[in-house]
Amino acid sequence: MVVLGIDPGSLATGYGVVSGDGRESFRALSCGLIRLHPRKSHAVRVGEIYRELSELIGELKPDRVAIETAFVGKNVQSALKLGQVRGAIMALSFNSGVPIFEYAPREVKSAVTGRGGAAKEQVAFMVASMLSLSSVPKPFDVTDALGVALCDLLRCGGGQKERQTDMKGSGGGLCGWGDFVRASPDRVL
């Protein structure tokens, strides 16, 4: 199974493509950062994210897309812009025929490190360890995206029975805790 993990942002969007069986043999196929110029209009930046991710989907043909849910801070304009980026990514996934699943940051951290409140440095270290990378990818947007892909593989990507999203709602939590336990017996105490 191949999963494209995305950490969306209006100025920097991290992506990570990971293959794996949902248990322990994970491999990073590609990762990087779509860095956007802040002086370009927001519409142009959203279009660039769509275009670059579309090329990536066409090239690597992931089975699934996993996206981190939005963190809503105090800045309403930032939240709106992030929502537009996420909407473009969801539309791209739908247009490409690739199911999309959402995971909260705490869920990603818990899947990768065992702690929902883990620091970004801990997530980055564990991502590099799980993917047998010689160094930790930078910046955190990239390791977060790889973590989202790993979370999806650990939660639902191990060939376990799962409910497929109909693209009308988010996919987060579709597999459930029971599927995670069955897919990852070595991670449960």
Swiss-Prot record:
Subcellular localization: Cytoplasm
The UniProt record lists the keyword DNA damage: yes
Cofactor note: Binds 2 Mg(2+) ion per subunit.
Signal peptide span: none
Domain of life: Bacteria
Recorded catalytic activity of this chain's protein: Endonucleolytic cleavage at a junction such as a reciprocal single-stranded crossover between two homologous DNA duplexes (Holliday junction)
Active-site residues (renumbered): 7, 68, 141
GO BP terms: DNA recombination; DNA repair
Annotated GO MF terms: crossover junction DNA endonuclease activity; DNA binding; magnesium ion binding
Cofactor(s) this protein requires: Mg(2+)
EC number: 3.1.21.10
Positions that bind Mg(2+) 1: 7, 141
Positions that bind Mg(2+) 2: 68
Entry GO terms, CC: cytoplasm; Holliday junction resolvase complex
Keywords for this protein: Cytoplasm, DNA damage, DNA recombination, DNA repair, DNA-binding, Endonuclease, Hydrolase, Magnesium, Metal-binding, Nuclease
Principal localisation: cytoplasm
Assembly: Homodimer which binds Holliday junction (HJ) DNA. The HJ becomes 2-fold symmetrical on binding to RuvC with unstacked arms; it has a different conformation from HJ DNA in complex with RuvA. In the full resolvosome a probable DNA-RuvA(4)-RuvB(12)-RuvC(2) complex forms which resolves the HJ.
Record-stated family: Belongs to the RuvC family.
Function comment: The RuvA-RuvB-RuvC complex processes Holliday junction (HJ) DNA during genetic recombination and DNA repair. Endonuclease that resolves HJ intermediates. Cleaves cruciform DNA by making single-stranded nicks across the HJ at symmetrical positions within the homologous arms, yielding a 5'-phosphate and a 3'-hydroxyl group; requires a central core of homology in the junction. The consensus cleavage sequence is 5'-(A/T)TT(C/G)-3'. Cleavage occurs on the 3'-side of the TT dinucleotide at the point of strand exchange.
Listed name of the protein: Crossover junction endodeoxyribonuclease RuvC
